[in-house]
């Protein structure tokens, strides 16, 4: 279970042995020689995720190199006015400034764009398929949460933490009703199966 949890956290967006180490795999009791087999097993067990990384990688490169729009499912990739746009199912767009092709440290072709780096300074940032997938997944997750916030606008929502909403209400408000409303599927992403869980507490804490 421990191996599975750290693998999900570290490997979902292209991470490998280095990502496992950064997440504390060695401190959790895993041995160095276990890490690469864990990466290989995770990727073997999740072929659709791995395939999506590289489908997105190709779509981004096509948009930047050929200026041609393309789609993967309900996500669109296009180049316009010196910007790379990734259009999400909600219609919201992620924007990457002045994208161009470059060569990464492994000698492979990669996409770079201008943005704020880790040192909080404007610089050219290198990216690739799995990283763009991370941006897409987190952005869609945000849009789903925002849809839930609007659905529950009749409640007093005084905060949210990642995928959680914190609602202050009287004790006679039904938790089941709130969970049902929060788990409704947005009209712009039909077919996605959502379920919300909740709990009641006198003060905010992790369940």
Regions found by a protein language model. Give the residues of each.
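Conserved catalytic core of nucleotide polymerization and phosphodiester-bond processing enzymes
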Residues: 1-207
